[in-house]
């Protein structure tokens, strides 16, 4: 039986932690003409791409190898895929070229550090093979007239999610007053209808809130204030947690005539549903009053 030594376990652990991460590169500068511009590459020769400033928020998708400390893109070569690593040339930063690529460290804030990173700049008219630098800023290694920039990596995809979750766990928890989103006010599809019924010698105004479903007939007394609980039938689309609102009918008190107390029958029909959904059918509510003199 073979046992793993401590050195072997350490090697396995470091290999497991190494990962290929998806990144994009951006330029940071005090000069607004180039600040926050994404970086992309353009073909300038056989398996050779120069880095240029593209546009704000627009950047090429690249990869970063934690183990080899290299930034690279993948180049299709027939049925195989080869790495085209970032190299710092004599005057320009490029993908491809000789060597295994420049060793790059990425800080927690995304800043790239490598040999010559302190002198990186953006410049035009660098006499590149295809003359792209006539209209676009090339990413160069120093030089007179170059605008100083700092390269910053932004993680994308799953790496972005893991980075954001780790940073949020390290940050203090915000208070409820500052982080809670305002609660949405529920919207109910109800409508209010006002009916005018003439009595002798007084008049009464009745206001009903009718639901979007079929409502049940209710007899309402013509004097006093009455709360009608059966006017609204719970809507199928309404939230089950929301309590159905009650309808209050206010009427003007009047002397009750001698004999049988008069009553008024108020009925809400299905026409309310059409009016609530923007239809042209009016809500039909009938109030029949029987009076005995």
From Swiss-Prot:
Glycosylated position list: 131, 190
Domain of life the protein comes from: Eukaryota
The protein, known as: Cell wall protein PGA31
Function: Component of the cell wall involved in virulence which plays a role in the relationship between C.albicans and the host. Involved in the regulation or assembly of chitin within the cell wall.
Originating species: Candida albicans (strain SC5314 / ATCC MYA-2876)
Phenotype of the disrupted gene, per the record: Leads to hypersensitivity to caspofungin.
Modification note: The GPI-anchor is attached to the protein in the endoplasmic reticulum and serves to target the protein to the cell surface. There, the glucosamine-inositol phospholipid moiety is cleaved off and the GPI-modified mannoprotein is covalently attached via its lipidless GPI glycan remnant to the 1,6-beta-glucan of the outer cell wall layer.
Residues where lipid is bound covalently (GPI-anchor amidated glycine): 271
Disulfides per UniProt: none
Keywords: Cell wall, Glycoprotein, GPI-anchor, Lipoprotein, Membrane, Secreted, Signal, Virulence
Residue ranges the record assigns to the propeptide: 272-293
Low complexity: bias regions: 163-180
Any one of the GO CC terms: side of membrane
Topology versus the membrane: Lipid-anchor; GPI-anchor
Disordered: region residues: 161-187, 233-262
Signal peptide from the UniProt entry: 1-18
Induction (UniProt): Expression is regulated upon white-opaque switch, during cell wall regeneration, and when cells are grown on lactate. Also up-regulated upon milbemycin A3 oxim derivative (A3Ox) treatment. Repressed by BCR1.
Annotated localization: Secreted, Cell wall; Membrane
Family: Belongs to the SRP1/TIP1 family.
């Amino acid at each position: 039986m073979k046992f793993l030594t401590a050195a072997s376990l350490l090697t396995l652990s470091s290999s497991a932690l190494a990962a290929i991460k998806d990144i994009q590169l951006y330029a940071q500068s005090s000069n607004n003409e180039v600040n926050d511009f994404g970086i992309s590459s353009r073909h300038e020769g056989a398996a050779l791409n120069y880095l240029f400033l593209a546009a704000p928020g627009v950047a090429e998708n690249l990869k970063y190898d934690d183990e080899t400390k290299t930034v690279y893109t993948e180049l299709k070569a027939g049925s195989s895929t080869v790495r085209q690593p970032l190299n710092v040339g004599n005057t320009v930063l490029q993908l491809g070229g000789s060597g295994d690529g420049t060793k790059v460290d990425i800080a927690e804030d995304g800043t790239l550090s490598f040999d010559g990173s302190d002198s990186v700049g953006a410049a035009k008219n660098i006499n590149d093979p295809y003359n792209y630098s006539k209209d676009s800023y090339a990413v160069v290694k120093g030089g007179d007239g170059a605008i100083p920039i700092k390269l910053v990596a932004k993680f994308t995809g799953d790496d972005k999610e893991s980075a954001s979750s780790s940073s949020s766990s390290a940050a203090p928890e915000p208070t409820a007053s500052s982080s809670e989103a305002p609660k949405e006010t529920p919207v109910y599809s109800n409508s209010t209808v006002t009916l005018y019924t003439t009595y002798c010698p007084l008049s009464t105004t009745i206001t009903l809130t009718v639901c979007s479903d079929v409502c049940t007939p209710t007899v309402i007394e013509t004097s006093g204030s009455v709360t009608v609980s059966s006017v609204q039938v719970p809507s199928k689309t309404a939230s089950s947690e929301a309590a159905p609102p009650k309808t209050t009918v206010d009427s003007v008190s009047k002397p009750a005539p001698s004999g049988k107390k008069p009553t008024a029958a108020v009925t809400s029909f299905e026409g309310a549903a059409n009016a609530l959904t923007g239809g042209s059918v009016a809500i039909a509510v009938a109030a029949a009053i029987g009076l005995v003199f």
